Amino acid sequence: MITNTKLDPIETASVDELQALQTQRLKWTLKHAYENVPMYRRKFDAAGVHPDDFRELSDLRKFPCTTKQDLRDNYPFDTFAVPMEQVVRIHASSGTTGKPTVVGYTQNDIDNWANIVARSLRAAGGSPKDKIHVAYGYGLFTGGLGAHYGAERLGATVIPMSGGQTEKQAQLIRDFQPDMIMVTPSYCLNLIEELERQLGGDASGCSLRVGVFGAEPWTQAMRKEIERRLGITALDIYGLSEVMGPGVAMECLETTDGPTIWEDHFYPEIVNPHDGTPLADGEHGELLFTTLTKEALPVIRYRTRDLTRLLPGTARTMRRMDRISGRSDDMLIIRGVNVFPSQLEEEIVKFEHLSPHYQLEVNRRGHLDSLSVKVELKESSLTLTHEQRCQVCHQLRHRIKSMVGISTDVMIVNCGSIPRSEGKACRVFDLRNIVGA
């Protein structure tokens, strides 16, 4: 049963009604992109397809995919489908290599985005009565402003904290008594540690009721850790700058069974990450999105590199996405074995003495790749003897070996030894190219 505030009619429309709207909007998007973005005209022509070839949803697979490299190759503004005078805001991705991915928004795009994030917050149980602490970074990154304008559109009171200043953030959470927090899960763990320090222990009695977490993958075990230590319901919000920003999909409070994709604005597909072959709902693969209402920067079959599967709707008509299991481009191949950081995190957080703060380092020793895992002890476990620490190391090595089939070096360090992130956590250091240079 839906328990939160009034839903948008499309959230509970019939599947036929939703698909009719998607078909109508896809026809517009394909035509808009083809007529206004030279890159798309070239790609469609090279593939021998035209927007008129799209008549039903299954026809979308005839059209070529778009990649991050396509957007970078047309840096900065050649992918914009409207004149610059209609672009009211520019964001850029936080990529660490190459040129950033530039995203433009018309006023219509901004309004749609605010409405989508407001809908997401309603799905999380938010209302105009709430105070919402936004700890996503503000600036070119879409997280802070996307969350901010959505919370304002909801009618809530926004606390625009941004990232960083952890001690001050924790103090203001105590002083301002917010009901909801929007933040990356890794930075939330930093805030929890600081709250516990300031409170002299347990932080689960603070005012926060719900946390909306996104911008990086996180495991079910990390969710439970956050919920236990902060006394909240932790929900998953999904988004990416190239498609819109936060709010592409949102987990619903009444089911907490995977983010519902707002399919009236974003059309999802799953493909084989190796050859792009379309996969059926329920099969694991790479997630693609086509925007349905984006004016300034429409994207057609955009390859997110996120690995997941599509699931039937539960609380709403629209389909859900399973929790992201990893990224096809972040996957580590070590001695021919595919390893995802999320797999290792699942094992780490099962240990009662280990915290969720860890780093992975991949090196090359001669001609052989090696994986090292550095993980912090919980503060409550600092009294472990050397022998007990060695035993935990041995157990974690054994768990990882059983799971992925390769041996690892495990180092346990005291709490606070691993640098804390104020945004997305940087957990993987692949030094193979550096060593071989």
Curated annotation (Swiss-Prot):
A GO BP annotation: phenylacetate catabolic process
Single GO MF descriptor: phenylacetate-CoA ligase activity
The keyword Nucleotide-binding is assigned to this record: yes
Enzyme Commission number(s) of this protein: 6.2.1.30
Inducing or repressing factors: Activated by cAMP receptor protein (CRP), integration host factor (IHF) and by phenylacetyl-coenzyme A that prevents PaaX from binding its target sequences. Inhibited by PaaX.
Pathway(s) served: Aromatic compound metabolism; phenylacetate degradation
Domain of life according to the entry: Bacteria
Catalytic activity: 2-phenylacetate + ATP + CoA = phenylacetyl-CoA + AMP + diphosphate
Enzyme class per UniProt: ligase
Pfam family, one: AMP-binding_C_2
Keyword annotations: ATP-binding, Ligase, Nucleotide-binding
Description of how the protein assembles with itself and partners: Monomer.
Xref: PANTHER family: PHENYLACETATE-COENZYME A LIGASE
Function (record text): Catalyzes the activation of phenylacetic acid (PA) to phenylacetyl-CoA (PA-CoA).
Similarity comment: family membership: Belongs to the phenylacetyl-CoA ligase family.
Protein name (database record): Phenylacetate-coenzyme A ligase
Originating species: Escherichia coli (strain K12)
Organism lineage string: Bacteria, Pseudomonadati, Pseudomonadota, Gammaproteobacteria, Enterobacterales
